[in-house]
């Protein structure tokens, strides 16, 4: 997994730990009331541990989800039943976006593809004629 490579790559410095409520407010999940837990990192389902956050966005990872050691998981309402009781669920309808945003907080110097909302359809530009 790409996210896993980012986590073990020595060129990317983890700036954590962060308070869970800080992370959730930073990604606009303000209606949640979670404890003041410190989160050390964001990792994939397989390599995550206690005091880390992970994510589940597809049913094909349900077997990994059942075994995760993460304290928290970003997921949708549809997938929360795949997680063990030891992993607290954070419900979102934007799992991958929120995962990317939290990853950027932990690894601000990593290379990212920030969404460019200035991009236009080629038919709306001068390049159409070329």
What is each residue range found by the language model?
Residues 2-130:
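Domain-scale signature associated with acetyltransferase and cell-envelope carbohydrate enzymes
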């Amino acid at each position: 997994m790409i996210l896993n490579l980012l986590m073990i790559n020595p060129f990317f410095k983890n700036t954590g730990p962060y308070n869970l409520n800080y992370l959730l407010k930073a990604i606009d999940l303000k209606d949640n009331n979670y404890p003041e837990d410190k989160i050390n990192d964001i990792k994939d389902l397989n390599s995550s541990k206690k005091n880390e956050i992970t994510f589940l966005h597809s049913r094909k990872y349900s077997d990994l989800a059942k075994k995760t050691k993460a304290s928290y998981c970003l997921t949708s309402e549809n997938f929360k039943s795949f997680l063990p009781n030891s992993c607290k669920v954070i419900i979102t309808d934007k799992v991958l976006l929120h995962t990317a945003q939290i990853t950027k907080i932990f690894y601000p110097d990593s290379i990212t593809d920030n969404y460019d909302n200035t991009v236009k359809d080629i038919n709306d530009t001068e390049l159409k004629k070329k």
